[in-house]
Amino acid sequence: MKVVHTIQELRDHLRGQNRVSFVPTMGNLHEGHLALMKLARQHGDPVVASIFVNRLQFGPNEDFDRYPRTLRDDIEKLEKARDVYVLFAPDEREMYPEPQNYRVQPPDDLGDILEGEFRPGFFGGVSTVVLKLLSCVQPRVAVFGKKDYQQLMIVRNMCRQFQLPVDIVAHETVRADDGLALSSRNRYLSPAERAEAPALYQALQSLRQQVAAGARDLPAIEREAAQALAARGWQVDYLAVRRQRDLQTPQPQDLSAGEPLVALAAAKLGATRLIDNLEL
């Protein structure tokens, strides 16, 4: 595996390649990331991964400086997995050599709801860096995880509207044996919090069961699920059932027509904020 730190080095290694598959990450890799890279290898060759902690997507009170930088360990994991040909690990000056005054702004009806409501500017930062990375790598395929469901939708829509020649492929959420979605932030959980953490996924499973059984008062079942988590010590930001196609609130006619739905949640357990989702 080649490790490169500049855009020019990256392009030199990829010259003449037209089936590149790409997985962007912020590092601190776990089995979920490695699963994305394995899927990327099925869709193209060579596989490029990136590790870049993107300041633009962190709010003023978020954990940019605290976010784990584990490049040496990440390189060892990637070399052991043997799925990645080039790792692109730029520093901030390489990605942002001047102030990033031009940015991608997702539409309000998608970028300012759910995660966007609680993390203003987050999806603008994500969209901007993904567009820059796609410009650097120029892949045929890019792989994203469904754990970040709203992010996946925004990236797909951005690529479609800008007519970028890249297919966005989604990987199912990778979970621990007890159902907890794998996340770099899980390392912040205390042992007691780690034991409690699967309750978030269980709340989503309960919503799925109730909708499958015919529940139609979605605000009521969302409220009950959030209250149940709060009673266990969670601080719930949102727990919502939305349409898969646009993440808008389902209307009665959507429920009657069998519109595909997804339940999404974000909640804090202690100081750690976890997100998850489940297609219904």
Curated annotation (Swiss-Prot):
InterPro entries xrefs: Cyt_trans-like, Pantoate_ligase, Pantoate_ligase_C, Rossmann-like_a/b/a_fold
Pathway assigned in UniProt: Cofactor biosynthesis; (R)-pantothenate biosynthesis; (R)-pantothenate from (R)-pantoate and beta-alanine: step 1/1
Gene Ontology BP terms: pantothenate biosynthetic process
Key words of the record: ATP-binding, Cytoplasm, Ligase, Nucleotide-binding, Pantothenate biosynthesis
MF (Gene Ontology): ATP binding; pantoate-beta-alanine ligase activity
Residues at which (R)-pantoate binds: Q57, Q151
Enzyme category, top tier: ligase
Entry binding sites for beta-alanine: Q57
Recorded family membership: Belongs to the pantothenate synthetase family.
Protein name: Pantothenate synthetase
